[in-house]
Amino acid sequence: MKTMKQNNKNMKLQAMIMAAALTTAVSVQAQNGKYISKVYDFRPAPGQFVNEIPEWEEGDTEAGMIAKAEEQISGGTDNGMISLGGFGGYVVFGFDHRVVNVSGQSDFMVYGNAVYDLVDANYASSEPGIVMVSVDANGNGLPDDEWFELAGSDYNAANTYHGYQITYEKPDPGRATAADPDADDSAIIAKTYIKWTTNSEAEPEGYVKRNSFHTTNSYWPAWISDEKMTFEGTRLECLTVNIAATGLRYVATPRAWGYVDDLPNSANKGYDIGWAVDADGNAVNLPAIDFVKVYTAVNHEHGWIGEISTEICGAEDLHPTASVTEIESDGGIKIAGCEGMVKVQGAREVSVYTLGGALAARFEGDGEAALTPALYVVRADSRVAMVQVR
């Protein structure tokens, strides 16, 4: 079910980065902040905790709700929490520095609120979110460049749907709260509350249901006036089951690794930038990233518990003192990002590009180029590397 997308954005630059077969050494520099410093976007899909976590108040705008989300999840991991609603709802955030891809290690952690089942620890309150990362390729400080999914344990699972698309329709504000109760589940007071349609032939349409535990808030983000919201991404299979002999007791089997709010934080080892893949599933070599996006990855309702909705409590850079610095290839070419410059030894011709693809410097033989602090792509003969100028 994987869709094949034509990606024509920064194709030359991406080809250079993906061709890199160099080993990155990690050095230590001044202490960076460990936790989220900025939330760039917050757009939850409809859900029972929308307008509650964080709380929407009369007059709050989109910018105001983004600021509230930032207040909840920045600066630590226990300041608060946000809910992303149903499938596709997302948040985009960053740190006060680039997060470095340290080879063979988890690079950052995103904290959720999943817990193991009190009776059977094989199950948990899993509501998985997919993680994506991006590099500020155009250098404008905004998350408007290409996104790469971190391929978790279920990326290639048989029932994973790549290119899943869902559209939610805004509910009639005049509709009665308990307009359409579910005769089979007394907790559902409106089983046809918010309609959605998808591109899945197996489940082309359905509803976000209103339950009796959240009756005063709208499940539609109050600061979004659009009549429809569309999200697209990778949909994971719902692993929630009812294990009660009688009645309803919903639990889920957590995935092995790679998803937010799926395993409890104590069992989650974090996220490796080395898992990044492009839209076609090809591995991408990203020595560092600037932005992180998390979105709810399952579209499912489970009775009185409500829709599966990823919750986030914060994120942490697991090695904030790391930086992309010196690289040495098997061919003996040395490339180093230094204070205010790039240095290269052992190459005949050297070209240095910005992440936006513009030529920043060119020289022959051993040499150096004075540059402003940023990440650069360096081509030294047939060798390609991304380095950081401090």
Which stretches of residues belong to each language-model region?
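Bacterial N-terminal signal peptides that target proteins for export
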Residues: 3-17
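Bacterial N-terminal signal peptides
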Residues: 15-25
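Sec/Tat signal peptide C-region and signal peptidase I cleavage site
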Residues: 26-30
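A domain-level signal for the mature, folded cores of soluble proteins
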Residues: 31-127, 152-321
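Residue-level detector of buried hydrophobic side-chain packing
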Residues: 95, 131-133, 357
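Short loop/turn segments immediately following beta-strands, especially the blade-tip
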Residues: 134-140
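Tryptophan-centered short beta-strand motifs
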Residues: 142-150
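C-terminal outer-membrane/trafficking sorting elements
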Residues: 325-390
